[in-house]
UniProtKB/Swiss-Prot annotation:
Assembly and oligomerization: Monomer.
Entries under HAMAP family matching the protein: IPP_trans
Name of this protein: tRNA dimethylallyltransferase
Cofactor: Mg(2+)
GO terms, biological process: tRNA modification
Signal sequence interval, chain numbering: none
Pfam families found in the cross-reference section: IPPT (PF01715)
Binding site for substrate: T11, A12, V13, G14, K15, T16
Site features described as Interaction with substrate tRNA, chain residue numbers: T100
The protein's Enzyme Commission number: 2.5.1.75
Name of the encoding gene: miaA
PANTHER family the UniProt entry points to: TRNA DIMETHYLALLYLTRANSFERASE (PTHR11088:SF60)
């Protein structure tokens, strides 16, 4: 079984320095789990680690796709699993570092991202049926095959109604039966997981976020977005919808002032951090490290190493 160390946490909590020190002390290589740092040319707005900051530690899944290319959790899982095996086969420790919870979950849960349990044509048929005969009619189709879903779901919740019908068509099972079976497989993964969440006082974290945004602006975030625009990258692209990029685009298009853009970036980043913390609390395997309780980052690193070795 492959040992896997995960260092996660909200934006601006200070994952980078700790992960570098851990990699140095544990003979590891780092795999980024960040949905923005995968894009080339988007360095300032994503707070991408620099070559100097890497201190010679190999980093994976940074600068892997062009900003116009689609990249999703399935793409991440495939690339990350390959990197994990490559690092382990070199006799080194794979260390996942980042704040994109869905990316991390794709590795520590046995999610199936294939289309084995999907039927697009049937979905389209049901969606068209809802348009022609109404959502209530489509909902009524559940009554004889999945009474539990029929009672639990409302006709207006068409997406979930369609999913329940689709699952029954493909598997012959109710959505609840199907879900229970999949839950049993969820923890069937080839990794020995050590999962740490870095956290700190909320007010201090928000101050760090605000300061980080100011630093991004002084480093040239506006110029970075202008350059991306000149390269042909547009607001409708997934990459350009990231926090920091979309607000600067609004400013450059004359929709808002610069002060408003900065305010919105800070607000969006704080809200994102809040959502990240909510997400990370869902996993009972994670160990939370409150940075405020330690006098130095070196102390945190030593604590993590001790817990990993004692496990």
């Amino acid at each position: 079984m492959i040992d896997l160390l995960i260092i996660a946490g909200p934006t601006a909590v200070g994952k980078t320095d700790i992960s570098i020190e851990l990699a140095e002390k544990l003979n590891g290589e780092i795999i980024s789990a960040d949905s923005m740092q995968i894009y080339k040319y988007m360095d300032i707005g994503s707070a991408k680690i620099t070559k100097d900051e890497m201190k010679g530690i190999p980093h994976h899944l940074i600068d892997v796709v062009e900003p116009h290319e689609e990249f999703n959790v399935s793409s991440f899982k495939a690339l990350a699993e390959k990197s994990i095996k490559d690092i382990w086969n070199k006799g080194k420790l794979p260390i996942i570092v980042g704040g994109t919870g869905l990316y991390i979950n794709s590795l520590i849960y046995n999610y199936d991202f294939t289309d084995a349990d999907r039927d697009e044509k049937y979905r389209e048929y049901l969606t068209k049926l809802a348009e022609d005969k109404g959502k209530e009619y489509v909902h009524s189709l559940l009554k004889d095959i999945d009474e539990e879903s029929y009672e639990k779901l409302y006709p207006n919740d068409l997406k979930r109604v369609v999913r329940a019908l689709e699952v029954y068509k493909i598997t012959g099972k109710s959505i609840s039966e199907y879900t229970k079976e999949n839950e049993k497989k969820l923890y069937d993964i080839p990794y020995n997981v050590n999962y740490f969440i870095l956290n700190m006082n909320r007010e201090v974290l928000y101050e760090r976020i605000n300061k980080r945004v100011d630093i991004m602006m002084s480093k040239g975030l506006i110029e970075e977005v202008k350059k991306l625009e000149s390269m042909g990258y547009t607001p409708d692209m997934q990459s350009m919808k990231g926090i920091g990029y979309k607000e600067v685009l609004f400013y450059l298009n004359g929709d808002i002032s610069l002060d408003e853009a900065i305010y919105l970036i800070k607000k969006g980043s704080r809200n994102y951090a809040k959502r990240q913390l909510t997400w990370f609390r869902k996993d009972k395997r994670s160990i939370w490290i409150d940075k405020d309780k330690y006098s130095s980052e070196e102390e945190i690193v030593d604590k993590i190493i001790k817990m990993v070795k004692d496990k």
